Amino acid sequence: MMTRIEVLFPEFCSLFADSSNVRYLEKCLPDAEFVYTSYMDEPLFVAEKPDLIYMGAMTESAQEKIIKKLMPYKERIAQLIAEDVPMLFTNNAVEIFGQYIENEDGSKIEALNLYPIYAKRDMMHRFNCLLRGSFDDIQIVGFKTQFTMAYGDTDKYPFIHVDKGTGMNKETVNEGIHDHNFFATYLVGPFLVLNPLFTKYLLNDVMKLDVTLAFEPVIMEAYERRLKEFLDPKTQY
């Protein structure tokens, strides 16, 4: 049976080279079908169960449009999460699944409210940092560039335990959301290219495929060099 991967709203959700996550998956899975769902389309996941659902970074205005687009499918998304359908969301896509997003003036954009977090925007101050952490026994590296921090119960569904850098906010070592096969993280890079061990875990353990990573010797060498750099005490986070 052909593997089907749904890429949500690629015309909006490709900031910070996040589209390279999908391009890398295409190289790893040359026989898979990639369904690119535009904003005007009904998502594939409404009637079917894709083998993976992916959405990347977007502008704040696009984020508000996408919340409105997905709100009618909130219960369906919750059902798919409970049924272990693999999902990966990067950068500010994570905020769509929280309770709300708060603007500087205190006004709130209601989100899907699937997880007990909320985000606060600070559009005059972009936050950037490196991050090193772990998911189970996999070491994770990446970059953050964002106008928001997330608060609330960040302990309930943590994805990455942060060793160096900043978690969902400056007071927590938890980064992202992990629930069943739902993974969401603020990290960019692109995430799957920077973290081949997690990509291998996603494809083979979560999606139950049996694949070899594309360009594995090169991408592993780059990962090991970056990990060494991130482990250097002189590296500034």
Predicted regions and their residues:
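N-terminal beta1-alpha1 cap of cysteine-dependent amidohydrolase-like domains
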Residues: M1-Q79, V193-P196, K200-Y237
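Structural motif
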Residues: L52-G56, L88, A184-Y186
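Cysteine-nucleophile active-site neighborhood
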Residues: M58-S134
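Beta-strand-turn-beta hairpins that frame and shape the catalytic cleft
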Residues: M2-T3, D136-I140, I177-F183
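A glycine-centered loop/beta-turn motif at secondary-structure junctions
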Residues: N169-M207
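Glycine-rich nucleotide phosphate-binding loop and flanking beta-alpha elements
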Residues: E60-S61, V94-I96, M149-Y151, F191-V193
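Pocket-forming structural segment of enzyme catalytic cores
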Residues: E104-E175
